[in-house]
């Protein structure tokens, strides 16, 4: 059965379920974690997919974010929403991986792109344009345009004001339009 990337699962009900399970007690971590995982996996995966444009790499990033949540389960305040922490963790992990990849490519040299269909070339151009944006502009666009978060929610995840998110997303859209 194909994965439906368009229908987010209800986050609030899962987080309420996690609290109902008595997530503060050590024997309920698994139940709380399962509830949060069921609700938050799709948004975390979509953010990772937007960053990597690679299904397998996105799965790895999402799993790493949840693994870090599990490793810190005793420190988590399960009465608060966990999704913002997961999204920040995913973004930071993706950024770290891109830095390592950039260093590795600098050592090895540029990769040759074999021309393909026009759609493939357009996609590569869009990816190059997207990568030319600053990390803040990329993050603001991914969170507001792809994840459909409002500026305040995106600002909380990025650690900046809502106005800064709106400004960064606007700059990013303008730069993408200019490069078309």
Model-flagged regions — what are they?
Residues 5-17, 96, 103-128, 150:
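Internal acidic/polar
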Residues 19-25, 35, 125-133:
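Short amphipathic alpha-helical boundary/capping segments
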Residues 22-46, 56-59, 70:
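A short, charge-rich alpha-helical start-of-domain segment used by transcription regulators
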Residues 46, 60-67, 71, 80-92:
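Structural recognition of an alpha-helix C-terminal capping motif at a helix-to-coil junction
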Residues 71-78, 88-109, 119:
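Arg/Lys-rich amphipathic alpha helix in sigma70-family domain 2
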Residues 91, 95, 158-180:
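DNA-recognition helix of helix-turn-helix
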Residues 120, 130-138:
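Short helix-coil-helix linker/hinge
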Residues 140-144:
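A short pre-motif secondary-structure segment
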């Amino acid at each position: 059965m194909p994965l439906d990337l368009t229908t987010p699962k209800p986050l609030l009900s899962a987080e309420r379920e996690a609290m109902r399970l008595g997530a503060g007690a050590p024997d309920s971590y698994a139940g709380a974690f399962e509830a949060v995982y069921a609700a938050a996996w799709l948004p975390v995966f979509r953010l990772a997919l937007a960053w990597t444009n690679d299904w397998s790499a996105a799965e790895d990033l999402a799993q790493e974010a949840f693994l870090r949540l599990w490793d810190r389960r005793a420190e988590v305040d399960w009465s608060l929403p966990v999704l913002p922490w997961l999204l920040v963790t995913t973004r930071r992990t993706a950024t770290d991986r891109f830095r390592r990849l950039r260093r590795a490519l600098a050592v090895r040299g540029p990769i040759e792109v074999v021309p393909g269909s026009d759609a493939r070339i357009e996609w590569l151009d869009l990816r190059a344009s997207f990568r030319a944006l600053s990390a803040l502009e990329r993050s603001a666009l991914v969170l507001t345009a792809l994840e459909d978060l409002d500026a305040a929610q995106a600002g909380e995840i990025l650690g900046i004001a809502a106005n800064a998110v709106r400004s960064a997303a606007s700059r990013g859209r303008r730069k993408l339009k200019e490069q078309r």
